[in-house]
UniProtKB/Swiss-Prot annotation:
The gene is DODA. Binds 1 zinc ion per subunit. This is 4,5-DOPA dioxygenase extradiol. It comes from Portulaca grandiflora. In contrary to the fungal dioxygenase (AC P87064), this enzyme does not have a significant 2,3-ring-cleaving activity. Expressed only in colored petals and pigmented tissues, absent from green stems and leaves. Pfam families: LigB. Its cofactor is Zn(2+); Fe(2+). Its EC number is 1.13.11.29.
Length: 271
């Protein structure tokens, strides 16, 4: 049983959520993309939102199932005002149960509900700018960094029917997300970052999803700097899988911080 048939979507999205400080610091130009979400990217109000979070790591897929989740202040080095901010969107236990049902039906041995999990900054920070009214129910889905990209693609494939039930599907991570100790690049974009980012764009727009799933052997060597650990890349694979059996990828935004942190974001539309 679905979660509703009032609206139906063909799109799933991957967003590079970037530095959480952008919520309070207007110097971040990526704010403009998120603030313009409803006007420029997705004007239809969904029934609910499912966010695949780079900041929730588990051994098996877990989905937040609480009715009134709190926000999690899982960051440092941000304006002090952010620790007073809230995002009072309700949870959606019905959607959480539907996610669990679809994953089990899709062949996953385990999919857990977590009634205590709050909204981490993968969701509440971008949603505060995208949907500031906080009147749309939200669930979060975890990633499994111990499992490969194909696993995450298959998670998305199993959850693709949600789009037809009025659920806005968002993978929230980072297209290029190096370690914190990676030196900044002050002359444009670091060559390794630009090369990986361009490879990713080309592979997605050309429909070479298998190459993206196998990025550790298909991508330029710079992938080791772009994603030294995979948790920020895996939400892209879930969103890519949620595009459905056939989908077309589109780059919808790109900018950089410090020449190394890439904000490329994509839309996957079923055709």
């Amino acid at each position: 049983m679905g979660v509703g048939k009032e609206v139906s979507f063909k799109e799933s999205f991957f967003l590079s959520h970037g530095n959480p400080a952008m919520l309070a610091d207007e110097s971040f130009i990526a704010r403009n993309f998120l603030l313009g979400w409803k006007k420029n990217v997705f004007p239809v109000k969904p029934k609910s939102i499912l966010v695949v979070s780079a900041h929730w790591e588990t051994d098996v897929p877990c989905v937040s199932a609480g009715q009134y989740p709190n926000v999690i202040y899982d960051f440092t080095e941000v304006p002090a005002s952010m620790f007073q901010m809230k995002y009072p969107a309700p949870g959606c236990p019905k959607l959480a149960k539907r996610v669990q049902e679809l994953l089990i039906a899709g062949g996953f041995k385990s999919a857990k509900l977590d009634e205590e999990r709050g909204f981490d900054h993968s969701s509440w920070v971008p949603l505060s700018m995208m949907c500031p009214e906080a009147d749309i129910p939200v669930c979060q889905l975890s990633v499994q960094p111990g499992l490969d990209a194909t696993h995450h693609f298959n998670v998305g494939r199993a959850l693709a029917p949600l789009k037809g039930e009025g659920v806005l599907f968002i993978g929230s991570g980072g297209a290029v997300h190096p370690s914190d100790d990676t030196p900044h690049w002050f002359d444009g974009v670091a060559p390794w970052a630009a090369e990986f980012d361009q490879w990713l764009e080309d592979a997605l727009l050309e429909g070479r999803y298998e190459d993206v799933n196998n990025y550790q052997t298909k991508a330029p060597e710079g992938w080791k700097l772009a994603h030294p650990i995979p948790e920020h890349f895996l939400p892209l694979h879930v969103a890519m899988g949620a595009g459905g059996e056939k989908s077309k990828a589109e780059l919808i935004y790109r900018t950089w911080d410090h020449g190394t942190l890439g904000y490329a974001s994509y839309k996957f539309t079923s055709i």
